[in-house]
Amino acid sequence: MASGLVRLLQQGHRCLLAPVAPKLVPPVRGVKKGFRAAFRFQKELERQRLLRCPPPPVRRSEKPNWDYHAEIQAFGHRLQENFSLDLLKTAFVNSCYIKSEEAKRQQLGIEKEAVLLNLKSNQELSEQGTSFSQTCLTQFLEDEYPDMPTEGIKNLVDFLTGEEVVCHVARNLAVEQLTLSEEFPVPPAVLQQTFFAVIGALLQSSGPERTALFIRDFLITQMTGKELFEMWKIINPMGLLVEELKKRNVSAPESRLTRQSGGTTALPLYFVGLYCDKKLIAEGPGETVLVAEEEAARVALRKLYGFTENRRPWNYSKPKETLRAEKSITAS
């Protein structure tokens, strides 16, 4: 021991201060780390499986925490409308649902007297709601666009009451989750009928004034950001323009090429102007002269009908729903 101490003193004081190199211990994978890796792997496999084969949609009523009566009550409160609960429940019952449930009871061998369900179809409410909606929308649009012809008003009403727009509104109002239908997801035609049945229930519950407000808030707003001829499909805009100018005792328009660019390239651009009595009434672009002329005719029609891009927004602050609703209910 003494000899080792003497040898250490001979090496100097630096050796005493030298740090001892730690031993490198190979990492050991613990049970917890292995479990986490396996859990992440299984989770990724499940995610990829759901992406490849997504599960079929499930009715909300087949999931836990569902109370149909409470959901019906909450529907009216959510929309801030006063519905009669019996009418609202009837509005969500479709004839296809009644037939399918009665067929299931027959397959179970239930007697014929007990097979019939004590439910009423929403057919009558849907017809009332459809008729009132079309009449009310016609009154709204005629008041807002007095220069638009009857054909244009009818096309706008058909667009707003069409399957695509109505189903979009109905899904965002959770009408689909409350609809009693044979199939799920609910077919567009059935969903459209159910939405108009809800309008019919509101008409009988709260009167035409509140129903007109409902139609204004949820259907008229679907015109926001839409161009006139997206909703009204016309084949011959120049012919329609000539007819409209003739009604106003204005001479037929003359088309002239005003500007062009890249005529010899793959992407040419032409601007055609329409002149009446030597005055430019509209100008439109297009990849050919004919397309530019048709676009100029559409621009002129928008100006005539008051449906330009910079038109005044719809006035929601001071509606005249009382007068319009009275007209609608009288006409329907």
UniProtKB/Swiss-Prot annotation:
CDD domains: DSRM_MRPL44. Its main location: mitochondrion. GO terms for cellular component: mitochondrial inner membrane; mitochondrial large ribosomal subunit; mitochondrion; nuclear body; nucleoplasm; nucleus; plasma membrane. GO terms for molecular function: double-stranded RNA binding; endonuclease activity; RNA binding. Residues 86-228 form the RNase III domain. Pfam families: DSRM_MRPL44, RM44_endonuclase. Residues 236-306 form the DRBM domain. It is found in: Mitochondrion. Keywords: Disease variant, Endonuclease, Hydrolase, Mitochondrion, Nuclease, Primary mitochondrial disease, Ribonucleoprotein, Ribosomal protein, RNA-binding, Transit peptide. Transmembrane segments: none annotated. Its EC number is 3.1.26.-. It is an enzyme of class 3 (hydrolase). Component of the mitochondrial large ribosomal subunit (mt-LSU). Mature mammalian 55S mitochondrial ribosomes consist of a small (28S) and a large (39S) subunit. The 28S small subunit contains a 12S ribosomal RNA (12S mt-rRNA) and 30 different proteins. The 39S large subunit contains a 16S rRNA (16S mt-rRNA), a copy of mitochondrial valine transfer RNA (mt-tRNA(Val)), which plays an integral structural role, and 52 different proteins. It is linked to Combined oxidative phosphorylation deficiency 16: An autosomal recessive, mitochondrial disorder characterized by hypertrophic cardiomyopathy, liver steatosis, and decreased levels of mitochondrial complexes I and IV in heart and skeletal muscle. PANTHER family: LARGE RIBOSOMAL SUBUNIT PROTEIN ML44, RIBONUCLEASE III. Component of the 39S subunit of mitochondrial ribosome. May have a function in the assembly/stability of nascent mitochondrial polypeptides exiting the ribosome. Belongs to the ribonuclease III family. Mitochondrion-specific ribosomal protein mL44 subfamily. This is Large ribosomal subunit protein mL44. It comes from Homo sapiens. The lineage of its organism: Eukaryota, Metazoa, Chordata, Craniata, Vertebrata.
